[in-house]
A protein has these predicted regions:
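Conserved Nudix-box catalytic region and its N-terminal flanking loop in Nudix hydrolases
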Residues: 2-5, 56-98
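Unchanged
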Residues: 82-106, 112-168, 177
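Acidic, metal-coordinating catalytic segment for phosphate/diphosphate chemistry
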Residues: 4-51
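Conserved N-terminal beta-strand and adjoining loop/helix that marks the start
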Residues: 37-61, 81, 112
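A broadly conserved sequence feature marking short terminus-proximal activation segments
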Residues: 1-11, 156, 168-176, 182-190
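Conserved hydrophobic "DFG−1" position in protein kinase catalytic cores
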Residues: 54-55, 63, 130, 148
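Conserved beta-strand segments that form the floor/walls of ligand-binding pockets within enzyme
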Residues: 17, 34, 62, 76, ...
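Short connector loops at helix/strand junctions that flank enzyme active sites
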Residues: 30, 45-50, 70-72, 77, ...
């Protein structure tokens, strides 16, 4: 994906330690927000986002429709942010359960991508292949509808990286003739 060049737009203005003013200062390799009072450096790192790719028996992909916010009415592969103290696999299962009412088993990482579409919040997204082990789809949390879609009939998506990921899924599926993405045919790694 495209690298976002510096300088970054300043998002934080006060030191979290002492309340002093934060300003960008040049260090060896880049600008960093530095407290003018105590010298604290506020490192700006991407947040980890997690998403789970789930297909039904017909090989259709589960998507959720977002409610509220700037992506209202647009669809996405069910996703969320990892909590600071949360294991990445557990966090993925939790987010998926909150948004779709489905309990999943993680099979493997499908892809990892940088998300730069929101300048206020860069993330690293991890898309897992997963399969449903319990529950019926019901929208919750940030979603108001969940539905399965064939890969060639995907509705309007909220996030550019979901486009990339779905294109990868299409390629993988067509390369493997039938479907190696079907839950029963995904090799489980331990
Ligand atoms: Zn400070």
């Amino acid at each position: 994906m495209n690298y976002q060049p510096q300088p970054l737009t300043q998002r934080y203005f006060y030191c979290p330690l002492c309340g002093g003013a934060l300003k960008y200062q040049q260090y060896d390799e880049r600008l960093r927000l530095t407290c003018q009072q105590c010298g604290y450096i506020l490192y700006e790192n991407p947040i980890v986002g997690v998403a789970a790719i789930v297909f039904n028996e017909a090989g259709e992909l589960l998507l959720g429709r977002r409610k509220g916010g700037k992506y209202h009415g647009l669809w996405c592969i069910p996703c969320g942010y990892l909590e600071y103290d949360e294991d990445v696999y557990e966090g993925t299962k939790r987010e998926f359960r909150e948004e779709t009412n489905l309990t999943i088993e993680i099979i493997r990482v499908f892809t990892v991508q940088s998300n730069f579409h929101d300048p206020e919040r860069h993330t690293v997204g991890i898309w897992f292949l997963a399969k449903v082990i319990k529950g019926t789809p019901r929208a919750g949390d940030d979603l108001d509808l969940v539905e399965y879609f064939p890969l060639d009939k995907i509705p309007e998506l909220a996030f550019p990286t979901d486009h990339v990921v779905i294109e990868m899924l299409r390629r993988e599926r067509s390369a493997s003739g039938e479907s190696n993405l079907h839950p029963d045919r995904i090799p489980t790694t331990t």
